[in-house]
Amino acid sequence: MKKFSLVLLTLLTMLWIPTCFAQSTEEDPRDPNAPANTIKIPGRDIYVSGMDEPSRMSWDVANSACNCRGKGWRLPTIGELQTIYQYKDLFGNFSREYYWALEMNVRSGRYYNLKFTNGKIADEEVKERNKVRCVWVPARVD
């Protein structure tokens, strides 16, 4: 009986150790400095706020609101907004409205935005009021 117990214990240990080792060597995809209530954009080193700013804002106010959150916070680029739109179910709680982007359309002098019902990109005057979802980017260490 002792021999059987020893063999069984050895087999269970052999099965458990690789699993435990594999789990312990996996990297946490989150930056340890990432702010609370943020979600990492898959495949990018950018984190999305878990919620919209409390109201619709002009572009200037939206840009200031994100920057005032602290170092690393800003409006998302139009490319980042497109990626966020693709993963909107992962991030959750998006309105069916336009969201401001960081960049300006140099031809029109208006700022880009993206509609979260259909992914349509448009541009509008800075005084228009749209939804805002800030992003955080970790500081680069070169």
Predicted regions and their residues:
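Bacterial N-terminal signal peptides that target proteins for export
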Residues: 1-8
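Bacterial N-terminal signal peptides
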Residues: 8-16
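Local alpha-helix boundary/kink/capping signal
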Residues: 16-19, 82
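Short linear Ser/Thr-Pro motifs
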Residues: 17, 49, 101-102
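Extracellular adhesion/carbohydrate-recognition regions
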Residues: 21-73, 109-113
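An exposed tryptophan-centered "aromatic clamp" motif
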Residues: 59-72, 78-128, 135-138
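Short, solvent-exposed mixed-charge patches
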Residues: 141-142
